[in-house]
Amino acid sequence: MAIKKAKRKSNVEEVKTQLLEIKTELKDGVFTFTGPMTINEFSKKIKKQAKDVILHFFKQGKMYNANQIINEEEIAELCLEFDYEFKKEEQITVSNFMDTLVLSDEAKDLEERAPIITVMGHVDHGKTTLIDVIRKSKIVDTEAGGITQHTGAYQIEYNGKKITFIDTPGHEAFTQMRSRGAKVTDIVILVVAADDGVMPQTKEAIDHAKSANVPIIVFVNKMDKPNKDIDRILSALSTLDVVSEEWSGDTQFIYGSALKNQGIDKLFDAINLQAEILELKANRNRDAIGTIIESHLDKGKGSVSVLIVQNGTLTPRDFIVAGSQYGRIRSIEDTNGNSLDAAYPGTPVIVTGLNYVPNAGDRFIALSDESFAKNIAEQKAFVDKQAELISRNTIVVQDGIKVLNIILKADVQGIAEAIKSKLLEIKNEEVKINVVRSSVGAITKSDILLAQASNAIIFGFNIRATGGIKTFAEESRVIVKTHTIIYELLDEVNELLNGLKAPKFKEVVTGEARIKKIFFYSKVGNIAGCEVISGKVTSGTKMRLIRNGITVHEGILDSLQREKNQAREVLKGFEFGTHIKKFNDIKEDDIIQTFEDVQI
């Protein structure tokens, strides 16, 4: 007899709510904004004269005009001056929502989960041998040159408690990969050889752990060696702010030998103690969220990913998004190859079903709304494509710093100068901005040719590129961006510096149909007999059911039936029959409205 699955809390509504676009507006005495703007823009939003705002700054000895860009501190200052409260909001997009997403769980739903451990250390300090002992397998012998070449995840059980381990590579070539590993990690095990001490990768591992605010347990390995120097290790680590408990610090130090299987149980005890202090908990009664640890393409299985569930439960047939990839989970196995019906918080598993290979370090989320999930993944794919285009428009200069070349066009000189000034204030450690040209007027072929020659991106403010110029730019492989709000232009430049720019979409109604009659069919439920009253209705599109002017359901329109034949679309004035997926409560005179999200 099949076990009935408990209903899990969906992630969809929380994601949709947090992806809502933040509006700059004054509402109920609170001014909400996302970044800098001109005095003119601020004045319009609060329905004041620009001269009143200019006067405020004049009294401070600042000679501002209506085109002056004011920063966040000045906006806050003005709000206080005009007796408004203010609120600075971060704009959340598909580019960053997985990093900022907040999932709410009630305390009663939370239960203890397995800690996730990353083992780090300098090459040849015995990190892989320690992992080998933990896994009770012989992965060491199969690795090239004795150095781990990939990231894996494994789970063991000690004293009735599960512990998950991530094995991150231990040398400089994989520093970025190791950094990704720290994002999912609860505790870092830092392996230091007793006969070698603190080395370059030891310091890097400490930096990664501290930047991720992850506690460290030090495993001093190779204690069986005759030439060990423990005091030197304790002293060197203390200068890196890793101070042992025996030196009145708060870091646990375990002494042992992975090769001799010594100190391993003490290490497990230390992990369980640290996990208790951290109070690691999760809600298994919700849809899953977690991190991709590694992935590859298998000829027989397609995309195969090793992932760790950090919250919720993952089951076969769940639809997930991981970076710009998506798909329905076909199979779940533990890291020993055993088939699983479900993966719970803290569990590493191997899954198949994604449309392509996600990146190691990508966050994943299960979304029960398949259409919404695909939309997010497709937008993220667009972001990635833009990032690739942007990378082609950067020049690597001395010391590895990249330059983003920009050609700026605006409708008036004052605005052009103000935007240029703000652009040059933008700080980024890896990329700097170079304004190749700043001028007034429409975008011309001369601008396109200069952009092509200098690998620049063209930004226009309060101007439009004509059809001919757009075509010429596309043929020349030059990116042209236009804006009418300054802070949006600045925000986009900031995103471009990180290789990110999410596309904007608007909803377009494609058709409406009135339900004239309802038929019942035992295999599917209610069938709606409809007539198209405007536009056209297409099968498989998004739809909403409207009753007396109120939306009562949103979903997907199933296949369309005209007489005895299936139809892809039905035009105005024609009749058809259809079924609304997972919804039966339809009535005569209800309106079926179909729509699609169109990129702006």
Swiss-Prot record:
Residues 121-128 are annotated as: G1. GTP binds at residues 121-128, 167-171, 221-224. One of its GO terms (cellular component) is cytosol. Residues 257-259 are annotated as: G5. Keywords: Cytoplasm, GTP-binding, Initiation factor, Nucleotide-binding, Protein biosynthesis. It is found in: Cytoplasm. PROSITE patterns: G_TR_2. HAMAP family: IF_2_B. PANTHER family: TR-TYPE G DOMAIN-CONTAINING PROTEIN (PTHR43381:SF5), TRANSLATION INITIATION FACTOR IF-2-RELATED (PTHR43381). Belongs to the TRAFAC class translation factor GTPase superfamily. Classic translation factor GTPase family. IF-2 subfamily. One of the essential components for the initiation of protein synthesis. Protects formylmethionyl-tRNA from spontaneous hydrolysis and promotes its binding to the 30S ribosomal subunits. Also involved in the hydrolysis of GTP during the formation of the 70S ribosomal complex. This is Translation initiation factor IF-2. It comes from Mycoplasma mobile (strain ATCC 43663 / 163K / NCTC 11711). The lineage of its organism: Bacteria, Bacillati, Mycoplasmatota, Mycoplasmoidales, Metamycoplasmataceae.
